[in-house]
């Protein structure tokens, strides 16, 4: 599991390098095909996404919860496999969810026509993931009602 304690050692393995333009402790990675750069600012404990990635809220752009490291990793993987930054939305308000209300999902991905087609709800390894998976299997969580 990625945590505040081990992310610094993990990022170079994922292609991140010291930012030449920063006087702070920042590691960054440029995704050539996506034309995007994402960074991790250790001094301020935050994730920095390219401006083309829409962020409806900035709740998950810090180190405060283990799940936010998973969101960051997922965005990096989406860029790595060829999604454009403009296709990625962080924390959009989404209809549905629990008790027929709206909720904020972690990541929304749009297709090439800018139509939403994939929601990604991130969970960190361990109890959070296991608890949520049990809820899905029991039908208590209505992500699948959005289809």
Feature annotation, model-predicted:
Residues 1-147:
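A short, conserved, highly charged catalytic patch centered on acidic carboxylates
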